[in-house]
Regions:
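A solvent-exposed, acidic/Ser-Thr-rich amphipathic alpha-helical stretch
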Residues: 3-74
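Flexible, surface-exposed loop regions and adjacent strand-edge segments
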Residues: 16, 127-129
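Short beta-strand edge/turn micro-motifs at domain boundaries
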Residues: 73, 92-124
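Generic structural "secondary-structure junction" signal
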Residues: 10, 29, 115-117, 129
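Short, solvent-exposed loop/turn segments at secondary-structure boundaries
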Residues: 86-88
Length: 129
């Protein structure tokens, strides 16, 4: 699903900015994403004990062509409901994706998750958005 050279970014400001110069909620490459998934699957993600139960809704998907036929930009809105032992919370915003065509499939090169309340107290988002 993700390209070998990929970026997963959750900005900490509504404007986004430059993740290499500003604080971000998350700014991961492929290795870091694989580490997160490994910890979730093995039980070493202590912030997910017990595991969250989530429901995700994605809407308003827009696909944009670029000058290069091997690249597509996609924008969508999302709503995530997360249930934990201390209650339920909602996370919402929009995602921007840059897809690149590799051989016979499309892969995510960049995923930017823009939370509408990114500059507020998010109580340690421990799920991969």
């Amino acid at each position: 699903m993700y390209a070998p050279e990929c970026i997963y970014w959750v900005p900490a400001t509504p404007e986004g900015g430059d993740p290499r110069r500003e604080v971000a909620i998350s700014f991961d490459d492929r290795r870091r994403l694989e580490d997160r998934i490994y910890r979730l699957r093995t039980g070493y993600a202590w912030s997910q004990a017990p595991k969250s139960r989530t429901v995700r809704m994605i809407s308003n998907v827009e696909v944009f062509a670029t000058e290069r036929t091997s690249i597509r930009m996609v924008r969508s809105n999302f709503l995530i409901s997360e249930f934990r032992v201390d209650g339920t919370r909602l996370l919402s915003g929009w995602c921007g994706h840059r897809f690149v065509q590799s051989a016979d499939r499309w892969q995510i090169q960049v995923r930017q998750v823009n939370l509408i309340d990114c500059d507020q107290n998010l109580r340690n988002p421990s799920i991969v958005l």
